[in-house]
Regions:
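Glycine-rich phosphate/ribose-binding loops and adjacent secondary-structure elements
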Residues: 1
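Functionally critical mobile loop/hinge segments
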Residues: 6-116
């Protein structure tokens, strides 16, 4: 989403500074988002999150192009994202060991899926 935001700004004639603002805005909006795919498949809830992130990218690009800057620079938001990612437990890092992947509905569906 951050790369898409930066690319959108660049394609629409924005400055490198505006690209950085768009990137930072997206990172601040999705900071801490976990990866909890049901049954370990990158489908639920990932597809909907990808759609939401696409909207985040376009919104961030529009904000940056409108002159709305990020108080925290892009490089620092990237560092913060890394720090948060390092702090997350393994269960929330695409392992299907936490979050939505461990709801009763998700576990029941995974059991049926892998029984095939």
């Amino acid at each position: 989403a951050a790369m898409a935001a930066g690319a959108a700004v660049a394609m629409l004639g924005g400055t490198p500074t505006q690209v950085g603002h768009a990137v930072a805005i997206v990172f601040k909006n999705i900071l801490g988002l976990v990866c909890d795919p049901v049954a370990g498949l990158v489908e639920v809830p990932c597809i909907k999150r990808n759609g939401s992130c696409a909207l985040q990218a376009l919104a961030a690009a529009e904000l940056a192009l409108a002159g709305i800057g990020s108080f925290i620079p892009a490089d620092e938001t990237i560092d913060a994202m890394k720090s948060v990612g390092d702090s997350l437990p393994c269960a929330l890092k695409e392992t299907a060991g936490g979050g939505m992947a461990t709801t009763p509905t998700a576990l029941a569906w995974a059991k049926k899926y892998f029984a095939k």
